[in-house]
UniProtKB/Swiss-Prot annotation:
Pfam families: LIM. Gene3D superfamilies: Cysteine Rich Protein (2.10.110.10). This is Cysteine and glycine-rich protein 2. GO terms for molecular function: metal ion binding. SUPFAM superfamilies: Glucocorticoid receptor-like (DNA-binding domain). The gene is CSRP2. The keyword Phosphoprotein does not apply. Totally down-regulated in transformed cells. May therefore take part in the control of cell growth and differentiation. InterPro entries: Znf_LIM (IPR001781).
């Protein structure tokens, strides 16, 4: 059947993807709202996507599902975590859910159908394409894309996320990293004082 003037088919939902809503990955097209991690359902972008057997994942879920397993493997502060992804629903024989809920926080039916603006994760105001940054799978204004503790400007590659908030690596390690003897402030941390 000819595709008269229509776009490519979405790799997730199978419907037609028109140019204005298209995201391309690994030779396939997706609607922006369908370009989600197969496990945790977070929005993806070119810096957060990982592909395995034609399925798309965020880097975190990909690492948990296909990365090295065992004691001591992790990502940054708190790496001695034995979480194997059970809380995210990762099981050896898991199958993806056929229902794909929308991730657009805008509850207006018109906005969901016709691409209403997403809401900034920090201030809650509308985020438009010209000022939008994706970090931790969520939209932010460029000016709101800062560490929650120190206010330092972040990039998608220099942030860490905890409970929906973003931090620079230094503040994350200081506030959520391992505590106790041997975890210190650099070269002088284990100095014996008399």
């Amino acid at each position: 059947m000819p595709n008269w003037g229509g776009g490519n088919k979405c790799g997730a939902c199978g419907r037609t993807v028109y140019h204005a809503e298209e995201v391309q990955c690994d030779g396939r097209s997706f609607h922006r709202c369908c370009f989600l991690c197969m496990v945790c359902r977070k929005n993806l972008d070119s810096t957060t996507v990982a592909i395995h057997d034609a399925e798309v994942y965020c880097k975190s879920c990909y690492g948990k599902k296909y990365g090295p397993k065992g004691y001591g493997y992790g990502q940054g502060a708190g790496t001695l975590n034995m979480d194997r992804g059970e809380r995210l629903g990762i099981k050896p024989e898991s199958t993806p859910s056929p229902h794909r809920p929308t991730t657009n926080p805008n509850t207006s039916k018109f906005a969901q159908k016709f691409g209403g603006a997403e809401k900034c994760s920090r201030c809650g105001d509308s985020v438009y394409a010209a000022e939008k940054v994706i970090g931790a799978g969520k939209p932010w204004h460029k000016n709101c894309f800062r560490c929650a503790k120190c206010g330092k400007s972040l990039e998608s590659t220099t942030l860490t996320e905890k409970e929906g908030e973003i931090y620079c690596k230094g503040c994350y390690a200081k506030n959520f990293g391992p505590k106790g003897f041997g975890y210190g402030q650099g070269a002088g941390a284990l100095v014996h004082a008399q």
